[in-house]
Amino acid sequence: MRKLTKGFLIFGVVSTILGFIMIIVGAQSNGIQSLLAMSKDPVYDNRTEEVTFGSEVEKLDLTLEEHSLTITESVDDKIHITYHPSVSGRHDLTTGMSDKTLSVTDKQASQHRFLGSGIESLLRIASNYSNRFDEVVLSLPKGRKLQAITVSANRRQTTIINATLENATLNTNGYLLRIEGSRIKNSKFTTPNIINIFKTELTDSQVKTEGRHLHVEDIQIHGKVELVACSLSRKIRS
């Protein structure tokens, strides 16, 4: 009996040592990164990447499924898009140009292998932890108007802050659309959920939620403006 107990003890010690060695080797050889890359949910890095576009862009088409979105004003006359890349690369942004229209999306085909419920749970925790890095920041050109802006953003929160949007169509399925300190003209925004608008100038535009929560504070109205909620519909003319 003592020999059997001693054998199990030796086996346990050896297994523990081998486990630590494998962890060290895996970390040194990017094994952890490779494991994270197998997650079916996006796991984002804390480093930032940026792409920039100039006057060659006259129209913008942005579609996001795996990122939250913040729209603001650029410091120059260029379009700047910043984001945190995903470990797998499957959820990174891809861009394309056609007829002076810039298309940006994070919708990519992804393959996922079954790794076992334990590892899947750990990867899900890692994904949730990295969600604070899921934001895409779109900085629109300062002093230059685009002919058309089309945005579809379907994750978490969409924020428009200190920005000027004209000829814009925005559809979002996130839980919140927040607009603050901005100028919106000839545009249409639609969401099924919460809309909060603060210190914003609205001109000939429609803001619509299919839900019941549409909150506005300190806004200026010019031309025909529609603020529409499930329980409230206001058509306002200056």
Task: Give the ranges of each region predicted by the language model.
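Histidine- and/or cysteine-centered catalytic micro-motif in compact active-site loops
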Residues: 219-221, 230
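Acidic (Asp/Glu) and glycine-rich low-complexity loops/linkers
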Residues: 2-59, 68-155, 159-172, 178-191, ...
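Cationic, amphipathic, low-complexity alpha-helical segments enriched
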Residues: 228, 232, 236-237
